[in-house]
UniProtKB/Swiss-Prot annotation:
UniProt keyword annotation of Aminoacyl-tRNA synthetase present: no
Name of the protein: Uncharacterized protein UU427
An annotated Gene Ontology molecular function: ferric iron binding
Organism: Ureaplasma parvum serovar 3 (strain ATCC 700970)
Matches recorded under InterPro entries: Ferritin-like, Ferritin-like_diiron, Ferritin-like_SF, Ferritin_DPS_dom
Alphabetical UniProt keywords: Iron
Pfam families to which the protein is assigned, alphabetical: Ferritin
Length: 170
C-alpha cells in the first residue's frame, strides 16, 4: 500500500522524537548519577534511553524499509534543563512521556484518517509501549512522592528494576 504524505510525516516525526529523547535521556541518566548520586535512578533513565534509541528506532526503521518509505533524520539535542533535585528530574521525564503519549495518539489518529490500517496496526505497538513507559516513570515519580529521602527512593527503584527484569524474562 502506498503511504500518504501525512503518514510518512508522522512516522518521520516519531522516528526523530525517539532519537532526540533517547539522546536527552542518556544525558539525564548522567545527571542522576553524577549530580544526584543515584545510580539506580540513572539506570532506570538509561534503560528508557536505550529503549528509544534501540527498540523504538529499530522498529520504525524496519517498518520503513518494509513499506518503502523514506526516513529523514532531523533532530538536534540541547539539554538545557537543569533540575535542582532528582524529584524535579523525574517529574520532567513524566511530563515528557505524557507529551509522547499525546504524540502517539495523534500518530494513530492520522493513520485512521488516512485509512492506513496497516500502519495503524504497526502504531498500536507504540501505544501499548507508551502506556508501559508512562506507568513505569509514574511509579518512579510516586516513589519520590512517598519517600522521606533519596536513599529510600534508590532502594525502591532497585527493587523495581529487579521486578521489571523478572517480568521481562517471563
Amino acid at each position: 500500500m502506498v503511504k500518504s504524505q501525512k503518514v510518512i510525516d508522522v512516522l518521520n516525526t516519531h522516528y526523530n522524537l525517539n532519537l532526540e529523547l533517547g539522546s536527552i535521556y542518556a544525558q539525564y541518566a548522567h545527571i542522576a548519577d553524577d549530580q544526584f548520586s543515584m545510580p539506580f535512578l540513572a539506570k532506570f533513565i538509561a534503560d528508557l534511553s536505550n529503549d528509544k534509541l534501540g527498540v523504538h528506532k529499530n522498529l520504525i526503521s524496519e517498518y520503513a524499509r518494509k513499506v518503502e518509505i523514506p526516513l529523514h533524520t532531523k533532530f538536534s539535542v540541547d539539554v538545557n534543563f537543569k533540575p535542582a533535585n532528582p524529584k524535579e528530574l523525574i517529574k520532567h521525564i513524566l511530563d515528557t512521556e505524557l507529551k509522547v503519549r499525546k504524540h502517539v495518539a495523534n500518530m494513530a489518529k492520522v493513520c485512521l484518517e488516512e485509512n492506513d490500517f496497516e500502519t495503524f496496526s504497526f502504531v498500536k505497538w507504540f501505544v501499548d509501549d507508551g502506556i508501559k513507559d508512562f506507568d513505569d516513570v509514574r511509579t518512579i515519580h510516586d516513589f519520590f512522592e512517598n519517600a522521606t529521602n533519596n536513599l529510600q527512593v534508590e532502594y525502591a527503584i532497585r527493587k523495581y528494576l529487579k521486578q521489571m527484569k523478572v517480568e521481562e524474562e517471563k
